[in-house]
Amino acid sequence: MNFEIWITYVATVLLLMSTPGPSQLLMLSNAATNGLRRGLFTAAGDLTANLLQMLAAGLGLAALIATSATTLAVIKWLGVAYLVFLGVKQILKARIAAPGDAPRASRKTLWMQGFITSAANPKAVVFFAALFPLFIDGALLFWPQFAILSATYLTIDGLFLTAYGASASWLARRLQGPARLWLDRIGGSFMILAAVLLGLKSLRNAS
């Protein structure tokens, strides 16, 4: 792959990620309440879903998913409902528990939250299927180029998520008492906001 094309691709991905989305908001919430090391399992779940979506795009499944409007709608709204449930649950736990006493979520739970939040946007398959061909040279082998584009995207996304998580974890360590209690509530609100963003995307795509 031409280096200039790769640099253009990197710039494009950076622009696309410049605005926080549902996965970034979830990472903020989980890293603030569970710490960065555990929060990274949320990022791992998100990246796992992204990888599967990329593979689906590379294998030519984009057209199938794009034509299955019912499947898209069901997956999206299940993801929305799941995030709302998590957000409300965290807000209620913050209200009844003493600050800092709430048990941390398991690594498996954090991974699953990240995975479901990303997988709730199955049109990502269509997005990757539309994005990658812009930077693939038809005269070269497809899969090596696909691997480079996929690895680059996952690396950039992982760095963004880690930066969000590190910032939230740093802030959480410096807040105590009532301030920490409000941080937990804000974290729950971030999850609900992530659900709202997913819902708005679904409604916008449906119109």
Locations of regions flagged by a protein language model:
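Short, strongly hydrophobic alpha-helical membrane anchors
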Residues: M1-E4, N205-S207
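Juxtamembrane transmembrane-helix termini in multi-pass membrane transport proteins
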Residues: F3-A73, F128-L154, G165-R173
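Short, conserved phosphate/pyrophosphate- and ester-handling motifs at nucleotide-, phospho-/glycolipid
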Residues: G21, N121, G188
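Selective transmembrane alpha-helices of multi-pass membrane proteins
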Residues: T67-R95, L154-Y164, A168, L175-S207
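Flexible cytoplasmic inter-helical loops of multi-pass small-molecule transporters
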Residues: L92-T109
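Selected transmembrane alpha-helices and immediately adjacent juxtamembrane segments
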Residues: G114, A119-K123
